[in-house]
């Protein structure tokens, strides 16, 4: 048994420990007690020495979505951060150097789906059309963005390891979850789940139609 030399606060947390693609680099993510400062270290399991590669700070707190969207590649890793005011995707070298901010704008990236080495493209889910909707997007090395999901509502996706295909889960206020198999251009190859039986059951109960609305409070 070896104790890793992680330079963290005495009352801090280690919310995640992740394998990278290098056997001598174990990613150790720490939070301070207030959970508004995140540090990531690469620890050598043999020497137990840990090197800091990333620090992120927030005025409020670091959301759990950040930990689960760090994906390690041979030369890079992904990171979601609200340091611009909105949750966006950043691309780092394995040495901890920021290569680029992948997404930007007045919207939130909800989930990073993966990076394709074939064409240096990033796939993600965001709510850039509306806070009430989520769609699947692709953005290439030049910053050209393509919306892959056609349905309006809540979309999520799970990609194959080669990033050529994905399963899309979609639902909205009147549509139970529909699952389709798509290629990485968004083309639907097969419908796997329709939930037609559930639709028919709900129709029998004549459930009132739900709708969203906005209103203004006294303080604006």
Regions found by a protein language model. Name each.
Residues 22-24, 74-75, 118-120, 164:
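Short coil/turn segments that connect the beta-strands within blades of beta-propeller domains
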Residues 98, 109-114:
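A structural signal for short, hydrophobic beta-strand segments that form beta-sheets
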Residues 49, 85, 98, 118, ...:
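Cysteine-rich, disulfide-stabilized extracellular repeat modules
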Residues 73-87, 116-118:
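Loop/turn-rich, solvent-exposed surfaces of beta-rich toroidal or solenoidal domains
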Residues 1-8, 13-42, 50-63, 67-68, ...:
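Non-catalytic accessory segments flanking enzyme active sites
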Residues 44-48, 93-97, 140-143, 183-185:
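Short loop/turn segments that connect beta-strands within beta-propeller blades
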């Amino acid at each position: 048994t070896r104790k890793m030399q992680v330079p963290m606060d005495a009352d801090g947390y280690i919310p995640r420990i992740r394998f990278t693609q290098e056997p001598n680099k174990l990613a150790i993510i720490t939070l301070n007690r207030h959970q508004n400062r995140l540090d990531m270290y690469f620890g050598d399991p043999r020497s137990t020495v840990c090197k800091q590669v990333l620090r992120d700070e927030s005025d409020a707190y670091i959301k759990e979505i950040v930990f689960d969207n760090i994906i390690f590649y041979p030369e890079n890793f992904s990171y979601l951060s609200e340091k611009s005011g909105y949750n966006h995707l950043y691309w780092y070298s394995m040495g901890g150097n920021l290569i680029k901010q992948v997404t930007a704008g007045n919207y939130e990236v909800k989930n990073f789906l993966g990076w394709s080495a074939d064409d240096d493209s990033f796939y993600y889910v965001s709510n850039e059309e509306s806070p009430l909707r989520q769609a699947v997007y692709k953005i290439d090395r030049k910053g050209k963005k393509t919306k892959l999901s056609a349905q309006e509502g809540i979309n999520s996706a799970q990609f194959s390891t080669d990033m050529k295909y994905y399963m899309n889960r979609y639902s909205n206020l009147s549509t139970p979850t529909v699952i389709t198999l798509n290629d990485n251009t968004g083309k639907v190859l097969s419908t796997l789940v329709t939930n037609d039986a559930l639709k028919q059951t709900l129709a029998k109960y004549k459930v009132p139609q739900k709708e969203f609305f906005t209103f203004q409070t006294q303080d604006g």
